[in-house]
């Protein structure tokens, strides 16, 4: 009698998420816009767009009075570094605990962030500070913006498939409030000022065992000739975020990419059990529901993140997944889709099945 050959599938485990203690409400955001831009000819439009985001609260690393100041790019980046070092380790530790692993079990750290810069990457500091093994690989990703959460999941999946039984740690650290530019007063900038928040998330992809999403396939898609639709203009004052007015409509060309990926796997993107996607704004979720022909309730986790935290960039997809875990997870072998959207315009997509915490054999 032949023994069943062991199969090792990468499993995305429960994410750990933390947001800073300073909170700003939509009402406070609207009042700030009115008081600081009272003479702006398009203020009514900006206020309406901010209200339409549905973002009720956002969390930021500094009190709003400090956030509104601009001490210079150098000082802001120092704040990014100090806040990341103060806040990331506890989030990482919770993710490791949830995955029932130690730092010495991790083979690669994938660190994503687009709101500050460090060299060496925070990965090097984490390896030293938290006693990861010195042979731990480092993959910092700095220029995929909001798509980086999905990209990190996909690169972790790739790594665990290339090295069976390996374990990957994903860390997303985004302090969007440190990118506030008081001189940027275009409608797109005013909208961004009411949309983005700060947050940190971490999750482990286990090469063997664990409860969560057993990753089966991933893919990427870039909408041609849209690289200027979401971008940074890097100046002496730091990162100036540019958002084209055509961005909210990008789900119409991206939905077919999601359908194609599912089709390659023999699945129907309109008939899955759970959806974990980046919520850049409410229209993204509304249009995904429309073009994928999926009940809006399917995107409740992503919408809750947007409502309670705002757009926390690469950390959104991990927080949405955390909410699925908090709801009790999905049925064993339930099928689902994960996706991050960001500059490029890029979609990073993954398909997987829910699995309980049993050894895959």
What is each residue range found by the language model?
Residues 61, 83-99, 155, 200, ...:
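Short, well-ordered amphipathic alpha-helical segments that serve as non-catalytic structural scaffolds
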Residues 134, 141, 151-155, 175-199:
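Active-site glycine-rich loop that binds ribose-phosphate moieties when present
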Residues 2-82, 182-249, 256, 260, ...:
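Condensing-enzyme catalytic core mediating Claisen C-C bond formation in acyl metabolism
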Residues 118-124, 170-191, 219-236, 282-290, ...:
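Active-site-adjacent elements of ketosynthase-type condensing enzymes
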Residues 13-16, 112, 142, 168-174, ...:
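Short beta-strand segments
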Residues 55-132, 138, 143, 269-285:
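Conserved beta-ketoacyl condensing-enzyme motif
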Residues 79, 90, 95-97, 231-306:
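A contiguous, well-structured pocket-lining segment that forms one wall/lid of small-molecule binding clefts
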Residues 89, 114-115, 121, 125-128, ...:
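Claisen-condensing/thiolase-fold acyl-transfer catalytic domains that form or cleave C-C bonds
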């Amino acid at each position: 009698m032949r023994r069943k050959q062991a199969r090792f599938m990468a499993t995305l485990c429960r994410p750990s998420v933390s947001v800073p203690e300073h909170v700003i409400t939509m009402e406070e955001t609207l009042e700030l816009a009115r008081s600081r831009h009272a003479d702006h000819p398009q203020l009514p439009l900006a206020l309406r767009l901010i209200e339409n985001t549905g973002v009720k609260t956002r969390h930021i690393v500094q009190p709003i009075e400090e956030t509104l100041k601009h001490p210079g790019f150098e000082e802001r980046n120092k704040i990014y570094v100090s806040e990341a070092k103060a806040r990331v380790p506890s989030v990482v530790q919770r993710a490791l605990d949830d995955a029932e692993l130690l730092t010495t079990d991790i083979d690669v750290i994938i660190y994503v962030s687009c709101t500050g810069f460090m060299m060496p990457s925070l990965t090097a500091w984490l390896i030293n500070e938290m006693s990861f093994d010195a042979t731990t690989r480092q993959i910092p990703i700095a220029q995929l913006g909001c798509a980086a959460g999905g990209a990190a999941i996909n690169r972790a999946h790739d790594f665990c498939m290339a090295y069976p039984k390996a374990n990957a740690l994903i860390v997303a650290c985004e302090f969007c409030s440190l990118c506030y530019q008081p001189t940027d007063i275009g409608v797109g900038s005013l909208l961004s000022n009411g949309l983005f928040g700060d947050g940190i998330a971490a999750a482990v992809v286990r090469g063997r065992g664990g409860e969560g999403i057993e990753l089966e396939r991933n893919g990427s898609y870039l909408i041609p000739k849209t690289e200027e639709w979401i971008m940074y203009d890097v100046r002496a004052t730091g990162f100036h975020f540019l958002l084209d007015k055509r961005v909210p409509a990008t789900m119409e060309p991206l939905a077919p990419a999601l359908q194609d990926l599912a089709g390659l796997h023999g699945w129907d993107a309109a008939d899955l059990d759970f959806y974990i996607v980046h919520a850049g704004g409410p229209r993204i979720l509304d249009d995904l529901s429309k073009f994928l022909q999926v009940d809006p309730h399917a995107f409740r986790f992503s919408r809750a993140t947007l409502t309670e935290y705002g757009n926390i960039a690469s950390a959104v997809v991990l927080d949405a997944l955390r909410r699925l875990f908090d709801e009790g997870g999905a049925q064993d072998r339930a099928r689902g889709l994960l996706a991050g959207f960001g500059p490029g315009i890029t979609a990073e997509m993954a398909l997987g099945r829910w699995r309980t915490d049993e050894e895959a054999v």
